[in-house]
Amino acid sequence: MSAGGGGQRDAGTAGGRRSKWDQPGPAPAFLLSGAAPLPGRPFPGGGDGGTAVGVSESSAAPSGALDAAAAVAAKINAMLMAKGKLKPAPNTADKLQALGKGPATNKSKDDLVVAEVEINDVPLTCRNLLTRGQTQDEISRLSGAAVSTRGRFMTAEEKAKVGPGDRPLYLHVQGQTRELVDRAVNRIKEIITNGVVKAATGSSPTFNGATVTVYHQPAPITQMSPAVGQKPPFQSGMHYVQDKLFVGLEHAVPTFNVKEKVEGPGCSYLQHIQIETGAKVFLRGKGSGCIEPASGREAFEPMYIYISHPKPEGLAAAKKLCENLLQTVHAEYSRFVNQITTAVPLAGFAQPAAINSVPSQPSYYPSNGYQSGYPVVPPPQQPVQPPYGVPGIVPPAVPMAPGVLTTLPTGVPPVPTQYPISQVQPPASTGQSPLSAPFLPAAAPVKTTLPAGTQPQVQPHPQGQKRRFTEELPDERESGLLGYQHGPIHMTNLGTGFSSQSEIDGAGSKPASSSGKERERDRQLMPPPAFPVTGMKSESEERNGVGSLPGSHDHQAKKMKTSEKGFGLVAYAGDSSDEEEEHGGHKNASTFSQGWSLGYQYPSSQQRAKQQMPFWMAP
């Protein structure tokens, strides 16, 4: 029976006839129908008998393993589709929905979270970096979400004309959970941010499972700078603000080193500003020593301080410090110029200091005599030689001239008592007694307070001495005096001015000698062009003055006037000696002022009387 049964089975197998052993066939058919739609794993042979027999033999595998395989296959397909490497056909989707396992697959696909990040307007380097497969694989590995490129690059005009099915370039991100998608999107945003700006681009987007556009804001910012990798250093260079402050001492005195004053010792001033503010500060322009790389020489601009800083606030702080530095330098230069201006007159007009020290000089004259003391003084007095420099020195003495004139008339009573004594005594004693004993106490304050005004009042003493000497000695002395140009004469005035003032005060009692003495003083004040002629006239005048009586005063005045014409005095208006005669000499003052007016071409003696002090000496 067994053999017959075996033969029947073989016959049934060959002839397609079925036996009772073929009943389990429908079970494998169910498995086939469920396992066939697995994508990428099709089974050959749809449902013929041979296949059913083979599957019935392998039916030992449990049905749960098939379900697990179907689930794994669905998951793999979902990952491939998320990466864009597998695009499911519509018929496959229909099969998935038609088959028994379709609802489970659809459920897993609905669980994927999708997000979109637009990269159409980011800089070119960012766009190239994000569309590279290597970058997208790195993002997928770090985040667990799939990243793919969608759409195409569009310009602004193309975006305005875009059709409904066309979209600008963007990144498609999808993952199993929202956290994975957020992680991928944040990484994309970080890459874009590093390429565009340092600041944050905005809050992270929220996903509700639908398509979300994450990145729109940086579009206008990115248009400013096309280069992304070089952006941070290039941005810092572009944003450097700079300014310049001109020193303003282009015409400074050469001895004032402007560059050194501004930079400080070892450039310490500018380095301090750099340390305080972080700015770049250095000198440029003429005289700065800064060589321009383009021209190989200093800039043609005046010297200035160049300031540059990345931020306007730092530039303002550095500029303020530089302004303070320049103010200090300008103040120092002003003090320097004031010192120069005060030192230069002292060098050119050293005689005021020497004149102020004259009160000690009379001690030389009494001891050595007039002639011996005379050569000692000329060297310091040589700068006084220009006659036109004297008016510049006279003004300080003029305010004192009224004091001198008032004090001298008050001292007139004691002066006549001493005047005859000086005439009677021998020449050597007269040179000592009037200077040392009687007249120094009265005239000392006048000498100290008059730096230059004493010069006009001093001259007459040589004449007083000459009246006391013999006729020959004054001649030699006068010629010797006039041989020295002008400085020695002024020195003589300084040394013998005390007795001359007393003699001027005694003009009321001795008018004849006074007139000759005044003429002599005027002659020596402004030396005449021809010295020998003047010396002869002065000698004759002196002789007549010594031997004349008070009754011959008018005659002396006339002779003095004619001699004044011969002198040709340079205009020397406002001398203190003239004012002295106007107050001290009664008749002699009027005649002498007329003589001066003839020599000076003065308007009239009345105007001289009105104008006691010249206009440039008015206080």
UniProtKB/Swiss-Prot annotation:
Residues 552-564 have a biased composition (Basic and acidic residues). Its main location: nucleus. Residues 506-515 have a biased composition (Low complexity). Residues 1-58, 488-619 are annotated as: Disordered. GO terms for molecular function: RNA binding. It comes from the Eukaryota. GO terms for cellular component: cytoplasm; nucleus. CDD domains: KH-I_KHDC4_rpt1, KH-I_KHDC4_rpt2. This is KH homology domain-containing protein 4.
